[in-house]
């Protein structure tokens, strides 16, 4: 499911994190244990670029293949931010966002649980030594074979939003606990809305609760998802209010007391996260302050993944048309850059002119030109950037793309024989500058 991980020699990872998290098992050690290795590179945060240059010059002189750098320090920082802003909400990381094994391992070591959407994702998480009680099978419409597998391995918490799903679960996994997935009335203007596909409408809540009750299934709570990427935090307010109404409806039907609220995903790091956390806590206080025993979970994906990964690509071709510069790189829309199409992402590139301008590899102060950057495949759709300003570069120079952890390699293909799954990941641990 994920590519190879390369660990570059450095200090003992347990020592690196000791002062950061204060004893106990080291998340970095857990991450580096993948493939039986135990070392990462400790860096100041502003030294990541130098680290990437060292990889380019020392490790990839001949291959010149694209690679990722996973900054474990950024992951630790993001988990600290989560625990500070939402201390009572336990994250179930959305595996679909980025299943890199070292990344999942460090999240697990720091206490994250996992949101899986398929048998394959469940198998993958279990293969990392993570117990099934730390998984929510958060797909409201599952193949029967996947439900059978979940029952077999002990994944006992799942979502539903249709009567047919009730019948499948009753038949194949009657001990499962259910979360009724509801549709938020506002999708938050998210780049990737979830409402058109998933979530019970208000008028469907009562029949769906009754269906589960008649099937003698336990409905433990409610889930929702306001959509992914740049969602309006106000959408949480209405969704949490609607969830409270479902709790009340279940109580009126004489069902067992609901104990779980899943506030879904849609969280983005930075200022938007701060705003979202305030909105979520405000709504929880307003609607669930009388539920002290309530377990609250969330399904963040991009919050943890997006800024932790940086992608480096090689320029493999060049064409000049007047002032226009056109470059081909060895990753594109059918690979890591599929986020441009499917996640509606905007990517940014930084040059590393290791061949053409070694005395000024970042090309600081250099003249820039309107530039088009193409991916490597033969499809004209495979265009990463248009009308983008870049300096004069040459074949075998590099373009580096930050913030490439969310819905990138995870959804890439091997179209035209360009093997996305073969892109390697190097590990580093950065400290704040």
UniProtKB/Swiss-Prot annotation:
Q: Which key words tag this protein in UniProt?
A: Alkaloid metabolism, Chloroplast, Lyase, Plastid, Pyridoxal phosphate, Transit peptide
User: Which of the seven top EC classes does this enzyme belong to?
Assistant: lyase
Q: Which cofactor does it need?
A: pyridoxal 5'-phosphate
Q: What is its EC number?
A: 4.1.1.17
Identify this protein by name: Ornithine decarboxylase 1B, chloroplastic
Which Pfam families does the protein's record reference?
Orn_Arg_deC_N, Orn_DAP_Arg_deC
List the top taxonomic levels of the source.
Eukaryota, Viridiplantae, Streptophyta, Embryophyta, Tracheophyta
* Catalytic site positions: 378 (proton donor)
The family database entries (PANTHER family) matched by this protein are listed as:
ARGININE/DIAMINOPIMELATE/ORNITHINE DECARBOXYLASE, ORNITHINE DECARBOXYLASE 1-RELATED
Gene Ontology BP annotations: alkaloid metabolic process; nicotine biosynthetic process; putrescine biosynthetic process from arginine, via ornithine; response to jasmonic acid
For the null mutant, the annotation states: Reduced alkaloids and nicotin levels associated with a lower putrescine production. Occasionally, an early senescence and a lower viability of the older leaves is observed.
Q: Would you say which domain of life the source belongs to?
A: Eukaryota
Gene Ontology molecular function terms on file? ornithine decarboxylase activity
The pathway is: Alkaloid biosynthesis; nicotine biosynthesis; Amine and polyamine biosynthesis; putrescine biosynthesis via L-ornithine pathway; putrescine from L-ornithine: step 1/1
Cellular-component GO terms for this entry = chloroplast; cytoplasm
Which amino acid positions bind substrate, per UniProt? 342-343, 379
Give the chief site where it resides. plastid
The residues that hold pyridoxal 5'-phosphate are 228, 266, 299-302, 407
Q: What induces the gene encoding this protein?
A: Accumulates transiently in response to jasmonic acid (MeJA).
The Swiss-Prot or TrEMBL record describes its family as follows:
Belongs to the Orn/Lys/Arg decarboxylase class-II family.
What is said about its interaction partners and assembly? Homodimer. Only the dimer is catalytically active, as the active sites are constructed of residues from both monomers.
């Amino acid at each position: 499911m994920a590519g190879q991980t390369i660990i570059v020699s450095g200090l003992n990872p347990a020592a690196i994190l000791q002062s950061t998290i204060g004893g106990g098992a080291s998340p970095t050690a857990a991450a580096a244990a993948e493939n039986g290795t135990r070392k990462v590179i400790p860096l100041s945060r502003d030294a990541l670029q130098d680290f990437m240059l060292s990889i380019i010059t020392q490790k990839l002189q001949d291959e010149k293949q694209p690679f990722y750098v996973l900054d474990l320090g950024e992951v630790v920082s993001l988990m600290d931010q989560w625990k500070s802003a939402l201390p009572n909400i336990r994250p179930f990381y959305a595996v679909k966002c980025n299943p890199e094994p070292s990344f999942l391992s460090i999240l697990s070591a720091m206490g994250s649980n996992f949101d899986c959407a398929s048998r394959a994702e469940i198998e993958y998480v279990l293969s990392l030594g993570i117990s099934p009680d730390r998984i929510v099978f958060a797909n409201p419409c599952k193949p029967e074979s996947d439900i059978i597998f979940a029952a077999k391995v002990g994944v006992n918490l799942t979502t539903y939003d249709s009567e047919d799903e009730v019948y499948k679960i009753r038949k194949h996994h009657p001990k499962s606990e259910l979360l009724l997935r509801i549709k938020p009335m506002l999708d938050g203007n998210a780049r990737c809305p979830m409402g058109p596909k998933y979530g019970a409408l208000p008028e469907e809540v009562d029949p769906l609760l009754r269906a589960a009750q008649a099937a003698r299934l336990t409905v433990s709570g409610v889930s929702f998802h306001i959509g992914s990427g740049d969602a309006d935090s106000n959408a949480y307010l209405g969704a949490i209010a609607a969830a409270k109404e479902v709790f009340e409806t279940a109580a009126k039907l004489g069902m067992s007391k609901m104990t779980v609220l899943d506030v879904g995903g849609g969280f983005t790091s930075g200022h938007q996260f701060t705003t979202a956390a305030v909105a979520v806590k405000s709504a929880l206080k307003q609607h669930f302050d009388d539920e002290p025993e309530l377990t609250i979970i969330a399904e963040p994906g991009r919050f943890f993944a997006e800024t932790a990964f940086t992608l480096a690509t090689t320029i493999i071709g060049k064409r000049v048309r007047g002032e226009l510069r056109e470059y081909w790189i060895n990753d594109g829309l059918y690979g890591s850059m599929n986020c441009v199409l499917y996640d509606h992402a905007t990517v940014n590139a930084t040059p590393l002119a290791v061949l053409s301008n070694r005395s000024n590899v970042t090309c600081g102060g250099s003249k820039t030109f309107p530039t088009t950057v193409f991916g490597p495949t033969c499809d004209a759709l495979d265009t990463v950037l248009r009308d983008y300003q870049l300096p004069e570069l040459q074949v075998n120079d590099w373009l580096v793309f930050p913030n490439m952890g969310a819905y990138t390699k995870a959804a890439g293909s091997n179209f035209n024989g360009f093997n996305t799954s073969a892109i390697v990941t190097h590990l580093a641990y950065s400290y704040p500058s």
